[in-house]
Amino acid sequence: MMKQQFFLFLAVIVMISSVIEAGRGREFMSNLKEKLSGVKEKMKNSWNRLTSMSEYACPVIEKWCEDHCQAKNAIGRCENTECKCLSK
């Protein structure tokens, strides 16, 4: 009888610690999601601010624009942060 109570007591302790650890895991994941969404918003805002200034954005966009237009058999130009494909 004493052995059964002892093992039951150990099982209860293990179950309680598992529940506590699971709660910490959820808390950790929610904190991680919050931080990642904050970083995503900061990057998005920075990108929007960068692309709103054509003198800074065109060098960033131009390489993508050239590749994009080359696939269409055209020449890519960046004008006012917009990619324009000109026929060859």
Swiss-Prot record:
Q: Indicate whether Secreted appears among the record's keywords.
A: yes
Offer an example of a GO molecular function term for this protein. Answer: toxin activity
Organism's domain of life?
Answer: Eukaryota
- Which keywords accompany this UniProt record? Disulfide bond, Ion channel impairing toxin, Neurotoxin, Potassium channel impairing toxin, Secreted, Signal, Toxin
Q: Which residues belong to any copy of the BetaSPN-type CS-alpha/beta domain? A: 55-88
**One GO CC annotation, please?**
extracellular region
Localization in the cell: Secreted
What cystine linkages occur within this chain? 58-78, 65-83, 69-85
Tissues expressed in: Expressed by the venom gland.
Q: What family does the Swiss-Prot or TrEMBL record give for this protein?
A: Belongs to the long chain scorpion toxin family. Class 2 subfamily.
Protein name in the entry: Potassium channel toxin MeuTXKbeta3-meucin-24
